Curated annotation (Swiss-Prot):
Side of membrane Cytoplasmic, spans: 1-12
NCBIfam families to which the protein is assigned, alphabetical: 8a0101, PRK10476.1
Keywords, in A-Z order: Antibiotic resistance, Cell inner membrane, Cell membrane, Membrane, Signal-anchor, Transmembrane, Transmembrane helix, Transport
UniProt organism field: Escherichia coli O157:H7
GN (gene name): mdtN
Similarity comment text for this entry: Belongs to the membrane fusion protein (MFP) (TC 8.A.1) family.
Protein name: Multidrug resistance protein MdtN
Length: 343
């Protein structure tokens, strides 16, 4: 009987090599994930403002359409300026009338001021005459008992004293009248200042009737048309600030240890995953609402965890500023993937 030849033992080297390569690949993946965190829980965002008129009125011109791009200084809409133009004309007419009244009153005051100076001199003269008449009467009355003067002399002294007092009172009234005329001009001048303030305010309202874009942006949520009455401080539409786009990426708290402001980032949008955008970390969130109870602080962003039956790391929003965004691709709320490259 012929013996069967023994099979050579199979080498274990290929299997060990595969296991070793798998371990190396696993270590590399773990290192890569730890050193260059990535997340697809991200979305595009930008700053927005509510475009509100600061004056009320009917919209007579609407220069934009919904989702239209605008440049800084472009006309957005115009409110009917006629009521404000009428108020301006009325205030300017009041100012002109006041100026004429002040001019005429000033002429009268100048004349009265000249008379007031004369009246002041007359007051002093009348005061001196009244004092002299009073002194004369005081000296004359005792002499009547001695017989040095007659009763008629005393009567004349009394009459002279009364006449001097009457003259003094008359010139004092004239002086008061002149002073009141001068103060009347001051009141008109104060009234003129109030009218000038009204004119300045009306001009400001007239300027506010024309609303222009404060920055480069895009119009959204436009739901009005020409003829609509716009109320002051009520939004007409929203304007996206397209000068600066950023991505809010929610990273696990275990990924944050090497992330700093200025950390380079790569962004891909779901609308075109083959195109990448460079950016830098602007800031890292310092508070979120916990979804498993505990202290709840109003105003904090809430980031839901992906599974509830396992204790997983919380995620915090990281704000990434995009260097050169594509204005046609970037939209608020668009899904994104963010990759960070900590130094």
């Amino acid at each position: 009987m012929e013996s069967t030849p023994k099979k050579a033992p199979r080498s274990k080297f290929p299997a060990l090599l595969v296991v070793a390569l798998a371990l190396v690949a696993l270590v590399f993946v773990i290192w890569r994930v730890d050193s260059a965190p990535s997340t697809n829980d991200a979305y595009v965002s930008a700053d927005t403002i509510d475009v509100v008129p600061e004056v009320s009125g009917r919209i007579v011109e609407l220069a934009v359409t919904d989702n239209q791009a605008v440049k800084q200084g472009d006309l957005l809409f115009r409110i009917d300026p006629r009521p404000y133009e009428a108020n301006l004309a009325k205030s300017e007419a009041s100012l002109a009338a006041l100026d004429k009244q002040i001019m005429l009153t000033q002429r009268s005051v100048d004349a009265q001021q000249f008379g007031a100076d004369s009246v002041n001199a007359t007051v002093e003269k009348a005061r001196a005459a009244a004092k002299q008449a009073t002194d004369t009467l005081r000296r004359t009355e005792p002499l009547l008992k001695e017989g040095f003067v007659s009763a008629e002399d005393v009567d004349r002294a009394r009459t002279a004293q009364r006449a001097a007092e009457a003259d003094l009172n008359a010139v004092l009234l004239q002086a008061q009248s002149a002073a009141s005329a001068v103060s009347g001009v001051d009141a008109l001048v104060a009234q003129r200042a109030a009218v000038e303030a009204d004119i300045a305010l009306t001009k400001l309202h007239l300027e506010m009737a024309t609303v222009r874009a404060p920055f480069d942006g895009r119009v959204i949520s436009l739901k009005t048309s020409v003829g609509q009455f716009a109320s002051a401080m009520r939004p007409i539409f929203t304007l996206i600030d397209t000068r600066h786009w950023y991505v809010i990426a929610n990273f696990r708290e275990t990924d944050l240890k090497n992330i700093r402001s200025g950390t380079p980032a790569t962004i891909r949008l779901m609308s075109d995953s083959g195109k990448t955008f460079e950016g830098k970390v602007d800031s890292i969130g310092y508070g979120v609402l916990p979804d498993d109870g505990g202290l709840v602080l109003g105003g904090l962003p809430k980031v839901s965890r992906s599974i509830n039956w396992v204790r997983v790391a919380q995620r915090f929003p990281v704000k990434i500023m995009v260097d050169k965004p594509d204005p046609e691709m970037f939209r608020i709320g668009a899904s994104a993937v963010a990759n960070l490259e900590p130094q």
